[in-house]
UniProtKB/Swiss-Prot annotation:
Species, as recorded: Danio rerio (Zebrafish)
Function (record text): Translation initiation regulator which may repress repeat-associated non-AUG (RAN) initiated translation probably by acting as a competitive inhibitor of eukaryotic translation initiation factor 5 (EIF5) function. Enhances histone H4 gene transcription but does not seem to bind DNA directly.
Gene: bzw1b
Lineage, broadest ranks: Eukaryota, Metazoa, Chordata, Craniata, Vertebrata
Family membership: Belongs to the BZW family.
Transcription in keyword set: yes
Name recorded for this polypeptide: eIF5-mimic protein 2-B
SMART domains, alphabetized: eIF5C
């Protein structure tokens, strides 16, 4: 008996229906641009209609592939050539950011168009940030009016969280800085940003992406000083930015001072040399005694390897503070400095759980060696303590405070009898 091998079925000639979700027209940049430009020309200056058009077009146009083209058109009216000029061989629209009215109200309305688009098509978020970075690099190729509009728009978008402050890195481009384009653009941008949010919010956004210490880079190296920065931004009506830069400069100086102090303490440099060095730095960097006592405390306590056992760490801390108390005494000559020190001790003990029971012993020691006065301790107890662990620390201090009050009363009665 012979068996004929059965043939397997083949797929030749079979046609499969494409799923609806995969039916997306493929465009090259020129076709894509024509579709967007045509839609924008039809919607005109009605930004609500523009937003609806962009929302619906995403279903049939490939926004993911042509994100750069899309954003070029919305901002400049057409595809941009390197340097910022519009490509000559492409269709363009007169309805875009650069041809709109140069005022904050109009730019806020355009910001809403971008917000709606990116909320609807989340994948455009990264491409939009890259677009703004590119546009900032092209600033020299734009007119002053176009720069102003872009600055206002960017400030609003930074304020409402649609952009990260990391885009500001483009403003540190050497050519933009040398031509003075960067600081002029930054003024418009910060005014717009601060009108959306306060300076604290702006500062937080800058810190988040490590831009807080780079603002001086908006100026050429030979003008990169706080004095020049302050004159420029204060003169432009942005004292908040000027003050922020000053605080950052001071913060940087304090960090360097603390680092140097820790090194000097660990090397066993004499107290006199350390105190003299600190006083010079205080003058040079305009650091108050109130700030200095905090820096000294942090430096002293950061220099140690602390025992993990609670019963041993107290003894270790008291010994360490007693030995270095002259360093604290040198910078606690004012009532406010003493209160600042007490608050720093409170924070330290709260943040380091092994020290929770050590607070009272530290304060008592510093009182005995004349770093802290009776008045400062009483004021801290009654009104100047922090919220951190206050119930624990106030309870610890009750007996000592009662003793101080009684001693004060006895002293007063003795004076009266005399």
């Amino acid at each position: 008996m012979s068996y004929q091998k059965q043939q397997k079925p083949t797929l030749t000639g079979q046609r499969f229906k494409t799923r609806k979700r995969d039916e997306k027209e493929r465009f090259d940049p020129s076709q894509f641009q024509e579709s967007i430009v045509q839609g924008l020309n039809q919607t005109g200056t009605d930004l609500e209609a523009v937003a609806k058009f962009l929302d619906s077009s995403g279903a049939k146009l490939d926004y993911r592939r042509y994100a750069e083209t899309l954003f070029d058109i919305l901002v400049a009216g057409g595809m941009l050539a390197p340097g910022g000029a519009l490509s000559d061989d492409m269709t363009r629209t007169k309805y875009c950011v650069f041809t709109a009215q140069e005022d904050i109200k109009t730019m806020k309305a355009y910001a809403q168009v971008f917000n709606k688009l990116i909320r609807r098509y989340k994948y455009l978020e990264k491409g939009f940030e890259e677009e703004i970075k590119k546009l900032l690099l092209f600033l020299k190729g734009f007119s002053e009016s176009e720069r102003n509009k872009l600055a206002m728009l960017t400030g609003v978008l930074l304020g409402n969280g649609s952009l990260s402050a990391a885009i500001l890195s483009s403003l540190f481009n050497d050519n933009l800085v040398k031509e003075g384009v960067s600081p002029a653009f930054a003024v418009k941008l910060f005014k717009s940003w601060i009108s959306e949010k306060d300076i604290n919010s702006v500062a937080g956004s800058l810190r988040k992406v490590s831009m807080d210490n780079r603002l001086m880079e908006l100026f050429p190296v030979n003008k990169r000083s706080y004095e020049h920065f302050s004159r420029y931004f204060t003169g432009a009506g942005l004292k908040e930015i000027s003050d922020f830069a000053r605080n950052q400069q001071s913060l940087g100086a304090r960090k360097e001072l603390q680092k140097e102090l820790q090194e000097q303490i660990s090397l066993g440099v004499s107290f006199k040399e350390i105190i003299d060095y600190c006083k010079e730095e205080m003058k040079r960097s305009s650091i108050s005694e109130q700030l200095m006592i905090g820096i000294m405390w942090t430096s002293l306590m950061s220099d140690m390897e602390w025992n993990k056992k609670e019963e041993l760490v107290t003894e270790q801390a008291i010994k360490h503070l007693k030995q270095h108390s002259p360093l604290l005494k040198a910078f606690s000559t004012q009532a406010q400095s003493e209160l600042s020190l007490l608050q720093r001790i409170q924070e330290f003990c709260y943040d380091n759980i092994h020290f929770m029971k050590t607070f009272q012993k530290m304060v008592l020691l510093l009182y005995k060696v004349d770093v802290l006065s009776e008045e400062a301790v009483l004021k801290w107890f009654t009104e100047a303590h922090l919220a951190k662990g206050k119930s624990v620390f106030l309870e610890q201090m009750k007996t000592f405070v009662e003793w101080l009050k009684n001693a004060e009363e006895e002293s007063e009665s003795e004076e009266e009898s005399d």
